[in-house]
């Protein structure tokens, strides 16, 4: 398996999905794992459960500035070359990947994320069967970002959308199977690359006991705050939703749960009723302390593990329609859907006003999770 991020600790949607496949494969044979490491990140091997993989190879990415000016300069160069940012960031390590294989032969090779799909050229020489796991569809994500962003940023996303689509058309049909998170994503993949064999493998989380509830007067948004759709969600919620809730509920706290809160500091600083936890060991337990989970995403692709984690905590969810896309959620049954800022605030207030409704929606979400979205249930979709 080759992954651009380590599966452990399984904090965040990408790591959780990758971890689910590592565990699935480890139950069926020996797994050798190749992961990329960002500068300054801890040793991924020390985070893995003992005995989960046979061998781990860590490829260190070169250091680069995370400042806005440096990021803009890098993306300007990528725009000129029409190379999507993540494809560019993880390209050029064929020699290291080949050395990690070291002449071995494998029954299956799994590549995580479409931006690493070009490594199929190296891995395919050693693997009888090649699988590409799409956490989302990059061309769709860039296309949606381009539709909501204005100016130069929107233009860049539209260019990267077309560049991503060209890569998807080229590489997806070259894999034995392509895993998509939902049937709606699978249909999009088939439209982009008609020759690809697509299998729906839903996002899922490990089965967990229902954690004790603290019922603090807190609403929660969880995820990696550095991820562009999450940054946009925080901005939208602060500007269009939070002002309504803050006025109506004078003791209410909005808590951001997840790593890189500094990425959204411009929208959350200066308000003592907005909290940021940073990384947490157990997102489900942290969510169980709250009353409502909010998913105010304006752009997305794939499906949202943040909703699954809220359901695992039996926490009621308010989401935008695109935030809940790909999941069998039903408005008024296991979550509430709202699109505009005022409608979103009204839906949250409706839940805060009724412990009965919170319990009904949270319990229904938990039942749906147990029925369809634990690792063991998701593994039934796989045949390798």
Show the residue positions of the predicted features.
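A short, well-ordered alpha-helix in the C-terminal region of glycosyltransferases
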Residues: 357-371, 381
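Short hydrophobic beta-strand element within catalytic cores of glycosyltransferases
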Residues: 306-309, 316-320
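Conserved nucleotide-sugar donor-binding subdomain of glycosyltransferases
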Residues: 67-118, 122, 152-172
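Acidic donor-binding loop of glycosyltransferase active sites
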Residues: 176, 288-302, 313-316
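Donor nucleotide-sugar binding/catalytic pocket of nucleotide-sugar-dependent glycosyltransferases
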Residues: 129-131, 139, 157-210
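Conserved acidic donor-binding segment of nucleotide-sugar-dependent glycosyltransferases
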Residues: 335-342, 350-355
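N-terminal subdomain of nucleotide-sugar transferases
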Residues: 1-59, 104
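Conserved catalytic-core segment of nucleotide-activated headgroup transferases in glycan assembly
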Residues: 200-288
């Amino acid at each position: 398996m080759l992954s651009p991020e380590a599966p452990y600790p399984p904090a965040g949607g990408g790591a959780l999905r990758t971890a689910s496949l590592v565990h699935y494969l480890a139950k069926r044979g020996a797994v050798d794992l190749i992961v990329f490491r960002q500068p300054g990140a801890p040793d991924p091997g020390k985070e893995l459960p003992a005995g989960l993989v046979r061998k781990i190879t860590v490829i260190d990415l070169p250091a680069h500035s995370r400042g806005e000016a440096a990021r803009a300069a890098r993306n300007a160069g990528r725009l000129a070359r029409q190379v999507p940012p993540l494809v560019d960031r993880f390209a050029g390590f064929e020699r290291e990947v080949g050395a990690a294989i070291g002449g071995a032969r494998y029954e299956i090779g799994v590549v995580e994320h479409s931006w690493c799909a070009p490594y199929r050229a190296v891995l395919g020489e050693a693997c009888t069967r090649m699988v590409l796991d799409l956490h989302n569809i990059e061309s769709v994500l860039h296309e949606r970002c381009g539709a909501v962003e204005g100016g130069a940023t929107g233009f860049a996303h539209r260019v990267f959308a077309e560049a991503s689509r060209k890569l998807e058309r080229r590489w997806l049909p070259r894999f034995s199977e392509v895993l998509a998170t939902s049937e709606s994503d699978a249909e999009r993949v088939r439209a982009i690359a008609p020759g690809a064999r697509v299998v729906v493998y839903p996002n899922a989380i490990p089965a967990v006991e229902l954690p004790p509830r603290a019922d603090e007067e807190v609403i929660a948004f969880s995820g990696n705050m550095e991820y562009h759709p999450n940054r946009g969600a925080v901005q939208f919620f602060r500007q269009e939703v939070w002002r309504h809730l803050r006025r109506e509920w004078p003791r209410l706290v909005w808590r951001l749960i997840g790593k890189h809160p500094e990425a959204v500091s411009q929208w959350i600083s200066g308000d003592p009723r907005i909290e940021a936890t940073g990384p947490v060991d157990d997102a489900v337990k942290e969510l169980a302390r709250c009353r409502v989970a909010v998913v105010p995403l304006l752009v997305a692709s794939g499906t949202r593990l943040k909703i699954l984690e809220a359901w695992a905590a039996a926490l009621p969810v308010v989401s935008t329609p695109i935030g809940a896309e790909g999941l069998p959620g039903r408005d008024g049954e296991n979550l509430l859907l709202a699109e505009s800022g005022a409608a979103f605030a009204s839906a949250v207030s409706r839940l805060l006003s009724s412990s009965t409704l919170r319990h009904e929606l949270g319990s229904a979400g938990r039942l749906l999770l147990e029925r369809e979205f634990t690792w063991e249930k998701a593994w039934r979709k796989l045949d390798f």
